[in-house]
């Protein structure tokens, strides 16, 4: 197999590393960035979401309405966040 074909095959398979080998599901984002939305940290919203504060003392943060995993949001709230050596964080979802 020519080297270019091997490189293209590797680049095609590389995104699959975001999936859990045991049948997990990829972390779901907003297709525009890291999957995190900006929500006010006040009111009832901060009780429902897992958030990362942008800056200390700020009323804005990056939040997930399901489960935050690294810098991404999992697809459903029942997912667990797992860390794969050399691949980073990913969501493992039941079913």
Swiss-Prot record:
Residues 25-45 form a propeptide. Expressed by the venom duct. Residues 1-24 form the signal peptide. The cysteine framework is XX (C-CC-C-CC-C-C-C-C). Displays a mini-granulin fold, a structure composed of two short, stacked beta-hairpins connected by two parallel disulfide bonds. This newly described fold is derived from the same cysteine connectivity as knottins (ICK fold). The name 'mini-granulin fold' comes from the structural homology with the N-terminal region of the human granulin. GO terms for cellular component: extracellular region; host cell postsynaptic membrane. It comes from Conus mustelinus. This is Alpha-conotoxin-like Ms20.4. One of its GO terms (molecular function) is ion channel regulator activity. The keyword Secreted applies. Hetero-, homo- or pseudo-homodimer (identical sequence, different post-translational modifications). Heterodimer of [carboxy'Glu-48', hydroxy'Pro-54']Ms20.1 and [carboxyGlu-50, hydroxyPro-56]Ms20.4 may exist. Disulfide bonds join 64-73, 69-81, 74-91, 79-93. Its main location: secreted. Keywords: Acetylcholine receptor inhibiting toxin, Disulfide bond, Gamma-carboxyglutamic acid, Hydroxylation, Ion channel impairing toxin, Neurotoxin, Postsynaptic neurotoxin, Secreted, Signal, Toxin. The modification 4-carboxyglutamate is found at residue 50. It comes from the Eukaryota. It is found in: Secreted. The modification 4-hydroxyproline is found at residue 56. Alpha-conotoxins act on postsynaptic membranes, they bind to the nicotinic acetylcholine receptors (nAChR) and thus inhibit them. Through its two C-terminal domains, this homodimeric protein would bind to two nAChR allosteric sites, located outside the nAChR C-loop of the principal binding face and at the adjacent binding interface in a clockwise direction. This toxin specifically blocks mammalian neuronal nAChR of the alpha-7/CHRNA7, alpha-3-beta-2/CHRNA3-CHRNB2 and alpha-4-beta-2/CHRNA4-CHRNB2 subtypes. Belongs to the conotoxin D superfamily.
């Amino acid at each position: 197999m020519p080297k270019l074909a091997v490189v293209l095959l590797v680049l095609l398979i590389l995104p699959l590393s975001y999936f859990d080998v045991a049948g997990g599901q990829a972390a779901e984002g907003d297709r525009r960035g890291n999957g995190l939305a900006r929500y006010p940290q006040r009111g009832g919203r901060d009780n429902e979401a897992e958030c990362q504060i942008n800056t200390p003392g700020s009323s804005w943060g990056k939040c997930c309405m399901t489960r935050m995993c690294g810098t991404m949001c999992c697809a459903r709230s029942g997912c667990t966040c797992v860390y794969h050596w050399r691949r980073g964080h990913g969501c493992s979802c039941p079913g």
